Amino acid sequence: MVPGSEGPARAGGLVADVVFVIEGTANLGPYFEELRKHYLLPAIEYFNGGPPAETDFGGDYGGTQYSLVVFNTVDCAPESYVQCHAPTSSAYEFVTWLDGIKFMGGGGESCSLIAEGLSTALQLFDDFKKMREQIGQTHRVCLLICNSPPYLLPAVESTTYSGCTTESLVQKIGERGIHFSIVSPRKLPALRLLFEKAAPPALLEPLQQPADVSQDPRHMVLVRGLVLPVGGSSTSGSLQTKQAVPLPPAPASAATLSAAPPQALPPVPPQYQVPGNLSAAQVAAQNAVEAAKSQKAGLGPRFSPINPLQQAAPGVGPPFSQAPAPPLAPVPPGAPKPPPASQPSLVSTVAPGPVLAAPAQPGAPSLAGTVTPGGVNGPSAAQLGGPALGGQQSVSNKLLAWSGVLEWQEKPKPASVDANTKLTRSLPCQVYVNHGENLKTEQWPQKLIMQLIPQQLLTTLGPLFRNSRMVQFHFTNKDLESLKGLYRIMGNGFAGCVHFPHTAPCEVRVLMLLYSSKKKIFMGLIPYDQSGFVNGIRQVITNHKQVQQQKLEQQRGMGAQQAPPVLGPILEEQARPPQNLLQLRAPQPQPQGAVGASAATGQPQPQGATQAPTGAPQGPPGAAPGPPPSGPILRPQNPGANPQLRSLLLNPAPPQTGVPPPQASLHHLQPPGAPTLLPPHQSMGQPQLGPQLLHPPPAQSWPTQLPQRAPLPGQMLLSGGPRGPVPQPGLQPSVMEDDILMDLI
């Protein structure tokens, strides 16, 4: 665990939303390594509080979110103009994304599609705002790295900002309080004009940092909202971070190349100096020639072989030879686990084929778990039955510190069961520590009780997470059902809070159990400040209750005054007693949660269920079709604050005849007429494409409306609508949060 060190001039506990917008053409390629070393890595260290490390699991819930947008030129057709990575809270993974950019194309163009990149970045900030509702305002920074002026063309791929020019986009960035910065290898007047137009209305800080921030007199570095080192280059820790990123191996020779990075990337910092007789442009050109030769020789179209040139200059080679790995198939039991950097992380705004969702880090709960051919997130039964579940095999070089049982409660799978009953699960587990570490576990009880907390509520506890020690949990796969349930819950946006009883005379009072989907291991964080951590958890739960109460009051006030005619009956239905709600539930069709359950269990799912028909808007059952509803979209009510709604959720109506009960334990039925924030059958990790379902469909069964088709792998990432919607990771319905928090409050 890396101790909680603060970066240069970095305020403690800074929660930031950072988006890097990078030109992915060959015009920037020869200069990117120098910009990365002198400006990008120091900026990441500033937001991360120190050099990014692969073992820093505390950063998974530290609050700061990073996202990457790569834009091209018009000659990239028919490919999408922009590639967008889903947000991550791991600075180390963000560095691997930077190293995986393929700088290609744009040789015949003097401009680049900066407007497309900035419009996608604005959509990301809109999504960040929805994710940050629990903690309020954050420090937002947009960093543009390019080497060409913008086209005089408006953005076309973005749905929200289509038609906006580059200048209007940077003005929107400044008006929304987003700090806009530019890094370019040469001084371009057009880019400086963009920086000036992005100045906030009331500029309270200097226009730019001192001139000596640039490490090269030819560079143009205009920054707001962050501090870069003045003079000198980046620290050795940043270079070691670069060294620790392995090259992604080709799938055909994964076992051979997995052992190659230690030899191909020797841990000697002086080797990051490029030989004097090779310029960066020559290195890029030779790599391109090698890549072309490998394509002709049939060695794979996307990867260049590891050659002596890369061994001589590893600091320059990876940015030009590294590429995102192709979609991965589920790893069979016992197969060697590829290195973390070989897993795909690029989520394009328009997927050209069946692309599988990326295994995400715990900080981005939306894309957790391995994507199986059925489209179900989470490890398969065959993988769970494998020897020690892949990543858990790494406990062989650790010391056993404690052995006992972990117990937790979850909702039973059939939704028809009384919601007041909880299903108690337990698994034998062992706690391991590294050699040389001393963990006093003599006074630990034999049974640890774990409660589940939505990880969104933990974003403000970043400093406490960093100031903690790390242990590894290993679970015995004797009970496959319990083990699958643990993987499903921990991989879908929840963290485990393990409480130690006050009767036990041990030093530890609370322990956080986190799941790393990339390494397939469970990590335990033991904060050094135990009392501060307990108080922090109590504070975030209290704040969550207050925020939900305020939202409920605002919804009632808004619904009584400004609700459109179509939404009026909905608010009236929500205000009626529970028995009326139960009567209204009867004539409705199959519950939406059952549709999600059919997708989760591999049953046929009707196509087009993600988005409503565009021909006629759907209203409540029995209401005539009217104009599309306008006004604010209401969030689901807080069942803890509304006793009537809570009693309804805790005592659902009996299942309808001919309708299978929902099988997914994490899907909850919503009150009738309440608009859904996300389509109920859509898992939290899948992007939201197309219009949202604002009303339940008419009283007809699904098979009579749409023909049934088996779900295809990756179908949730494909959409026939306009290109450009950005995934909304980490967005969870407040109904689920409150349901879990009932055990804590």
From Swiss-Prot:
Positions of the UniProt region annotated as Disordered: 233-266, 299-374, 584-738
GO biological process terms on file: positive regulation of transcription by RNA polymerase II; positive regulation of transcription elongation by RNA polymerase II; positive regulation of transcription initiation by RNA polymerase II; RNA polymerase II preinitiation complex assembly; transcription by RNA polymerase II
Subcellular location: Nucleus
Composition bias type Pro residues, residue spans: 324-342, 618-631, 652-663
Region ranges (Interaction with VP16): 389-543
UniProt short sequence motif LXXLL motif, positions renumbered to this chain: 645-649
Asymmetric dimethylarginine PTM sites in chain numbering: 723
Biased composition (Polar residues): 233-243
Keywords: Activator, Methylation, Nucleus, Transcription, Transcription regulation
Entries under Gene3D superfamilies matching the protein: Mediator complex subunit 25, ACID domain
InterPro entries assigned to the protein according to its UniProt record, in alphabetical order: Med25_PTOV, Med25_PTOV_sf, Mediator_Med25_SD1, Mediator_Med25_VWA, vWFA_dom_sf
Any Pfam family hit: Med25
SUPFAM superfamilies found in the cross-reference section: vWA-like (SSF53300)
Ranges of Low complexity composition bias in the record: 252-262, 596-617
A molecular-function term among this protein's GO annotations: nuclear retinoic acid receptor binding
Quaternary structure, from the entry: Component of the Mediator complex, which is composed of MED1, MED4, MED6, MED7, MED8, MED9, MED10, MED11, MED12, MED13, MED13L, MED14, MED15, MED16, MED17, MED18, MED19, MED20, MED21, MED22, MED23, MED24, MED25, MED26, MED27, MED29, MED30, MED31, CCNC, CDK8 and CDC2L6/CDK11. The MED12, MED13, CCNC and CDK8 subunits form a distinct module termed the CDK8 module. Mediator containing the CDK8 module is less active than Mediator lacking this module in supporting transcriptional activation.
Family: Belongs to the Mediator complex subunit 25 family.
Protein name: Mediator of RNA polymerase II transcription subunit 25
Native organism: Mus musculus
Lineage: Eukaryota, Metazoa, Chordata, Craniata, Vertebrata
